[in-house]
Every structure is written in C-alpha cells, then in structure tokens.
From Swiss-Prot:
Type I collagen is a member of group I collagen (fibrillar forming collagen). This is Collagen alpha-2(I) chain. Residues 77-91, 666-675, 928-939 have a biased composition (Basic and acidic residues). It comes from Paramylodon harlani. It is found in: Secreted; Secreted, Extracellular space; Secreted, Extracellular space, Extracellular matrix. Residues 25-45, 55-76, 174-189, 235-256, 300-310, 354-370, 405-424, 522-539, 551-561, 594-638, 645-665, 683-693, 714-723, 769-803, 811-821, 874-887, 903-918 have a biased composition (Low complexity). These protein fragments were extracted from an ancient femur bone collected in Roseburgh, Oregon, USA. Prolines at the third position of the tripeptide repeating unit (G-X-Y) are hydroxylated in some or all of the chains. The modification 4-hydroxyproline is found at residues 10, 13, 39, 45, 376, 379. The keyword Glycoprotein applies. Glycans are attached at residue 113. Expressed in bones. Residues 1013-1023 have a biased composition (Pro residues).
Amino acid sequence: SGGFDFSFLPQPPQEKAHDGGRYYLGPGPMGLMGPRGPPGASGAPGPQGFGPAGEPGEPGQTGPAGARGPAGPPGKAGEDGHPGKPGRPGERGVVGPQGARGFPGTPGLPGFKGIRGHNGLDGLKGQPGAPGVKGEPGAPGENGTPGQTGARGLPGERGRVGAPGPAGRGSDGSVGPVGPAGPIGSAGPPGFPGAPGPKGELGPVGNTGPSGPAGPRGEQGLPGVSGPVGPPGNPGANGLTGAKGAAGLPGVAGAPGLPGPRGIPGPVGASGATGARGLVGEPGPAGSKGESGGKGEPGSAGPQGPPGSSGEEGKRGPSGESGSTGPTGPPGLRGGPGSRGLPGADGRAGVIGPAGARGASGPAGVRGPSGDTGRPGEPGLMGARGLPGSPGNVGPAGKEGPAGLPGIDGRPGPIGPAGARGEAGNIGFPGPKGPAGDPGKAGEKGHAGLAGNRGAGAQGPPGLQGVQGGKGEQGPAGPPGFQGLPGPAGTTGEVGKPGERGIPGEFGLPGPAGPRGERGPSGESGAVGPSGAIGSRGPSGPPGPDGNKGEPGVVGAPGTAGPAGSGGLPGERGAAGIPGGKGEKGETGLRGEVGTTGRDGARGAPGAVGAPGPAGATGDRGEAGAAGPAGPAGPRGSPGERGEVGPAGPNGFAGPAGAAGQPGAKGERGTKGPKGENGIVGPTGPVGSAGPAGPNGPAGPAGSRGDGGPPGVTGFPGAAGRTGPPGPSGITGPPGPPGAAGKEGLRGPRGDQGPVGRGETGAGGPPGFTGEKGPSGEPGTAGPPGTAGPQGLLGAPGILGLPGSRGERGLPGVAGAVGEPGPLGIGPPGARGPSGGVPGVNGAPGEAGRDGNPGSDGPPGRDGLPGHKGERGYAGNPGPVGAAGAPGPQGVGPVGKHGNRGEPGPVGSAGPVGALGPRGPSGPQGIRGDKGEAGDKGPRGLPGLKGHNGLQGLPGLAGQHGDQGPGPVGPAGPRGPAGPSGPPGKDGRTGHPGAVGPAGIRGSQGSQGPSGPAGPPGPPGPPGASGGGYDFGYEGDFYRA
C-alpha cells in the first residue's frame, strides 16, 4: 500500500479483552524481539495513538511532475471572485493644437423637395422556426496552468541538542588529534530500527589504541515519512553510541512569494534566559584518514617596520665562547585568514536517548598486544555536534539561484557619480497642494497690452470717474484651467548680460536615501574545496575596481501601493542674496495703429452721476472676435492695495515657453551684510589606511658583538587557548545521489484484526510522491446548474488588441427599376401618381460569417509599481561553544645565548594622508544685513519692440439655411418594385484577442468533500511480548495479572 510498514510498533492496550473466561490486566516484562518477518497483508487502520505529538519532520523533496492526467468532467462554476481594486485613472492627454480653419466649400445647388411616399404594407408574420438540434456536450476543458508557487515559509526552529549517549566501556585513554575531514560518502536508505540486543558483560580493560583520523562525513539521506505516534514503550537496554547520521536532502526552495505590505515593527522583547549548557557526548568512532590539503601559497612580505635607534659603536670585546643553541626566535607575522570555505550543513538533531550509567574504571592493566579489528557496531543515537572544522577554500561560483526575499534597507552609502540622464517619463498627476509661499514682491509694470476692437455701438461721452470701491472679499479658488493652445513662436529676444553670482547658500541637510535596488538572484552553492594551509598575511593591496553591476532580477507581480512615506526634512533656507537695485522703467512702446473709428452719434447731454448700482451677475462669455490692431495706451491707474495671499492653486500643466524678455538694467550692488558665525566643527573623519612601505634606508654601522648571556630557564607550559566563537552556519551543499535500497526484511506472522477505531482526523502528513498516471475515467454526468452568484465588480479592462481586418464587402444587390421622371410642367403641379407595386419579399438571410484568423498578441502591459521591501529576518540562535583545546606539549630545547643586536632597519616612507572626514553640519544662519539704499537712476532703456499680432479668432457660427428658390416642382415618378436581396457577404475575420488581463483574486477555499471509502485493512502487527503475569481466581472467574 506504499510508504513504510509500522506494524512492528506495540499496539495500545485494550480496555478489557475477554478470552475464554480470562481477563488480562497488565503488561508483563518485555521479551526479546524475534527476527522481522515478511510484511503481511494490509490490515484495517489501527486506533488513534496515545503518544505525544512528534517533532515535525523535515520537508520531503519535491517529486518529479507526474504525467498529465486525462481531462476530468466539467467542474462546477466557482464562486465569484473578490471585487478587484479600481483601476488607476488614465493619464490626461495633451490638448492638440487648434486646427486650421477650412476653406468654405462651394455652395451646392438647391435640390427639389420630393413628395412623401406611401407607407409600406405590413409584412406577414413568419411561422416559428423548427427547434434546433441539441448540441453535443462540449469537450472537457484542459487543466489550467498551475498557479504560482507560494511564498517560502519561515525556517523551522532549530532542533534541540540530543542528550549524551551512554558511557563507553573502554579504558580512559587520551584523545588523539582530530584528522582532516574525509570525502562525502553516498547517502544510504533509511534503515529499520533493530531490536535492542542483550546487555553485554563488562570486558577486560584494553590498551589505549591510537586515535584514528576523523571518518568521512555521510551524505544527506532522504527524509523519512513521519509514522503514527505509538504508545510509550518500556525503556530498553542502553545501546551503543552510533555514528552521526547523514543529513537529509534539502527541500526544493519555493519561488519567492509576493512581498507583503510592510508591517509596523513591534517592541523589542526582553532577552531570554541563557539555557543550560549541554553535556559533551562521547566521541564517535574514528573514521578513515582524509587526504592532506594542498599547501597554500606563501604570502608577500609585510610592511617595513620603523627604524631602530642608531647605536653607538662599542669597543671590540674579547671573542666569547661558542654559545649553546639560542632559543626559538619570535614567530613571524601572522598570515591573513585564508579564504573562507563553505561550512558543512547541520545534521538533524538526534533523538534524546536515556543517560547511561557510568561504568567503574578498571585497574590499569599491562599493555597487551594490539587487539583484532572489531566489527562495526549497530548504528545508535546521534552524538553531540562536533567542533567546527577549519575554513576551506572558496569553491567555484555557482549558478544563479532563485531570487531571494528582499532585505531591509541598508544605511545610505556614499553619493555615487551622476548617472546618465534617463528617458522622459509620463506626465504625472498634479501633486498635493503645497504650503503657501512667502508673499512675493510687487512686480514691475508690464507693457501696454493690445487694444481690443471698438465696440459696435456709438461712442458715448466719457463718464465721470467713479468713487473707488471698497476692497473685495477674497473669492474661492477657481478650478484649474485646461491647457491653453500653444501660441505662435515669438522672435528671439536679445541675450541679456549674465547676472552677478549670488552668495552661495548654506548646505542643506542631506535628503532621505533613495529606495534600495532590487536584489539579484542568489548563486547556487559551490562545491566545497579542500582546506589549504593558512599562508602568512601579506600587505593590504589597493582597493580593486568596482565589480560589474548585476543584472536585474525577474520582475515580480505588481505589488499593492504602499503608504506614502513621510516627507524629508526641508533643507535650511539659504542666506538671502543681495537685492539688486530697481531697474529703470523702459520707454513706452510704439503706439499701435489707430483703428478706423465709426461715425460718431449724436452726443447726448451728460447726465447726473447716479449711485453705484449693485454688481450684476456675470454674463455668458461670448465668442472671442478677431484681434484688432493695437490701440493707444491708457493712463496709468492708481496702485491698488495689496490683497491677502490666497491659497495656492493646484499645479497647472506647463504652457509653452514664451519669448525671451529684454534684459533689465544692471542694478547696483547693495551693502555687504555682516559675516555669519562659524559653523560647528564636524566630527573627525576616519583614519586613512596605511601607506605603502617606503624604500630601504642606508645601512647603519655594524654593532659590536655582545657577551654571551646565561642560559635561560625553561618556561612553564602555556595555558590552553580559549575556544573561538563558532563560525556561522554555511550553505547546505548539493544533495548527494540516492543510496541503494536496503534488503527486504522477513515477513511477520499475521496478527489478529483489531476493532475499527473511529479516530479524529489527524494533521496532514507530508505530501507523498506523485503516483503513476491512472486510467482515464469516463466523464461524469453534468450536475445541475448552480445558482447565479452576485454580480462581481468589473475587473480592470485589458489592453485592447489590434482591430481585426474588415471583411470583404458583399456584392451590391441589383437595383430596382427606376420610374421615369414626369415631364417638367409649367403650370400647376400635376396629379399624384399611383402608388408602386407591393414591395418584394425579402431574400433569405445570408450565412453567418466564418471566424477570422486569430490576431496577434497585444502590446505588453506596463511594469507594475515596485513592492515594499521586506523586513529583516530575525537573527539566528548562537552556535554551541566548542570544547577547549588540549594544552600543547612542554618544550625541552636547550637555552640559547643572546643573539647579536640587529642593525637598524631603513626608514619607512610616510603613509598617505587619511580620507577627509564628513562635512560638518551647517552653521547657524547669519544675521540678515541691513537693507541697501536705493541706487541712482540708471540710463534710459532702449525703446521696446513692436508687439506681435494677436491670435486668429475662432471661426464664427454657421449661418442659417437659406430658403428654397422659386420654381415649379415636378410630380414624383411611380415607386419601382423592390430589388432582390444581394448575396450574403463573406465571412469577416476574427479580431485580435486582447492581452491577458491581470490575474484575478484567489477564489474562496472550497468546502471539505465527503469522506472517502474505508481503505483496505493494514497488515497485522507482530504478536505482543509475553506479559509474564500469573493467573488467579476471583468469584469463579480467572484473571491474569
């Protein structure tokens, strides 16, 4: 029936099983388990287990995709999807330029007014058509494309460290050196648990053998299927500590899910209590010796040391005696750390075994001959995790892996060079209304405008100047106007003189950092290379060039728009520039041509000045007339009072660029403001890196040879070094090949069938491997149509495809005979002609057009908005502390005499200057200087240029249609019979399909289906161990205890 056989587990005790008048109350001692029998027939599913829930197993490897199954029967209509989000409003198109006014067409000849024809007779009602043939059922639909892989789940909790295994039975020998890691072995199949063997007697104390090198690390085995949890069994005998099991194959990583919206970070939790340190387990059996790694390349020489002080030349002393060998010189410069290798994968946490009793140490025996090689023991429980190995060399770069989850935003880096200018983007929507700006200065008086056309009425006498009205209230802001028509290009004005450079403002605060770029796909793990010897550390080389920019990752699905970020702090306002002097008023432009005035009417007598009436309602705006020539400039009005600053209107669309104005006269330079205070000194920058070593200096004079010193005293052995922190967990290596299948066990005897238990539905196990393709089932009968669901909201419209080509036009029908026109009479209209014949019968309708060729795909949709960055993952748990290293052997070498004093080294060159520190913050804004006095009046400016002609006026309204001219109208001819229907037109081609719309919202989860039929009975379990009880009688019945 597939999967593993769990019939060897002990069955749960029955409440009260009756067997021939006897009752069994309790289990006896557990006997030895016999050899495993062959698997029996599948028995009925057993009752619900009573054990605690086991730890979740590792995810199994995703099986290969099965063959495509046959098309199933048509499914039921799914529930209506959730309403889609409303689409974004389309961008507003740019208003096109005004079209040129067309020429008036030639007026047509007035046609004759025809006589109204008679109404046609009503057609006969057709008989109802025969019912259509019932269509055959449609073919079953194909399976849809598989959905996207869900987001990768969070990593599971780290397994607990297993308890130490039972104590070994060997004598206490010293631990030998750990050999290098061997090659990775192939993964074996998951073995069945063996029966616990009898407890062996304590053997004689053997001699301590040499510690072998560490064995090869096993490959990762296939993850086993989690079986049902059985009842707790009796504690068995203490087993031997087994070798470390192979790690399982890593599960296939799912495709990255869509990044969710960024959540609000919660408060930082309190630090948890430090857990108790686990006991170090017994070391496992030694493996075969691995191959030695290659020797690393020696590092380059370190930088030259500082020169020593120049010693005085001493007197030559007597030649001393030949001294004994000197002590070992100081160690050389420590080499740089070798390239970091990929650390091995963590093995799965073992089951916590019972702590074995410590055996008593036997007396130290006489060293005997080397014993025979023992057989490998049964694999036992997993030992404690070993110390981390030495870092290996960096493996070759792997292939690109799937895109990882986006990291958190990093700190803003240094400002890079300016990139190339990007392409112009689409016109964005108007931004939010900004704060009201400072009130602007009063502008200079503009040039006189062009005079409008003179009114049609007679020109009246000028009225008396009215009383100046009061200040009006501020009106509400009007709606934003549409973009105006582009005006004609003006003539280019003269280039003005460059203005004087203003005082640079203070540096503003740096703006917020830009969004972080998308992370490229991660590379696959490279193979672990052999660990090389650590070379001596060379000098730091110059920084290498920047690497190539990674290619952008795959564009993810459009994420939902996140909330608007808070705006950055506004930069400090720069110091005000020196105000320029007011330029001279230019001369009045040339007076335009005076329009032709109409004839003056009779001048009326001036009336009395009436009281100002109420303001009338604003009338409809008439159409703009053609612009007339420029009139004379009117007198300058009195300056009005300055109104209050109104609210800022919405941003309008940018109009066309106007013609360049004339440059104003150069103003005089104002007085210089007081000097601002110095800003706060910025923090000191980081110390620069050490410079390259300088050239060797000249050799100093030779020093005298000193006397031989007394022999040194042997030092004490050094203390054991502290264990360094464990390295971070490495990337899991590639899965190894699957191992060979194990031998089939013996078949067990058939057990009695237990009662059928009705347990609750357990948690779903890991997905099994895809089964073979089943036979194609017959299509089921279609179910009744479901009730229509509520109307869903319209989805976002897809991009329209290209329009299909138009079908060919059908041949025109034959025109009916036209009646002859009557003679053109001269007298009164003739009598009305007789009505035409009965209209002809309509022809049969043509056949439906054939489907056209499929259109090409529409253009691709635009990229969606980038999703929010994911939050940073939680920090991993710290690794276990490694065991302390053994103390080194004590030195025995003889004590040497003092060596000769070395000559002073050459003087090193000075290192490069360190990098500049960051710019200090801007100092406080200086006090504003006094306002400069007005400059002298400048020379008179040049006369202004003649204004441009006004824009062409809009075309006037069309005139009314003229009356028909005189002339007699002839009688209408008789109506001809209806012509026959034309042949049916050809089939039009099918239009192009639109582009695929966005994926709909995931439908609601379906309800649970009915329970399936009961499975076949499982294989019977082995007979239970003998209880070992005794029988006793009570009230005529026998009981067993």
